[in-house]
From Swiss-Prot:
Assembly, per entry: Part of the 50S ribosomal subunit. Contacts protein L20.
Any single Gene Ontology cellular-component annotation: cytoplasm
Organism whose genome encodes this protein: Saccharopolyspora erythraea (strain ATCC 11635 / DSM 40517 / JCM 4748 / NBRC 13426 / NCIMB 8594 / NRRL 2338)
SUPFAM superfamilies: L21p-like
Official protein name in the record: Large ribosomal subunit protein bL21
Protein family per UniProt: Belongs to the bacterial ribosomal protein bL21 family.
Alphabetical keyword list: Ribonucleoprotein, Ribosomal protein, RNA-binding, rRNA-binding
Gene giving rise to this polypeptide: rplU
The protein's role, per its UniProt record: This protein binds to 23S rRNA in the presence of protein L20.
NCBIfam families: L21
């Protein structure tokens, strides 16, 4: 059984036991998380009806808070001597999916 959940502006296809990296969620490692915005559930039959999905919830456990890979930004303007370097590492949360309840 799998479900498609939306968190952090992105959609993820998850099943029980999966570990997914999502945008940063508040909470300590080991705490419980529930994903409310559910888009699709597949079990014996596929459910995409909004009324039926309101009863479904996906729960997970926070595994750890991490950072993504370093992204380097370099702005440059020709002939003026202007250049600017900047780096960024996105904060991520690893979540282990513990249950999909219908």
């Amino acid at each position: 059984m799998y479900a498609i959940v939306k968190t952090g502006g992105k959609q993820y296809k998850v099943a029980v036991g999966d570990v997914v990296e999502v945008e940063k969620l508040e909470g300590e490692p080991g705490s419980e998380v529930t994903f409310p915005a559910l888009l699709l559930v597949d079990g014996s039959d596929v459910t995409a009806d909004a009324d039926a999905l309101a009863k479904v919830s996906v729960t997970g456990k926070l595994v750890e808070q991490t950072k993504g890979p370093k992204i380097r930004i370099h702005k440059f303007k020709n002939k003026t001597g202007y250049h600017k370097r900047q780096g960024h590492r996105q904060k991520l949360t690893r979540v282990e999916v513990t249950g999909i309840t219908k």
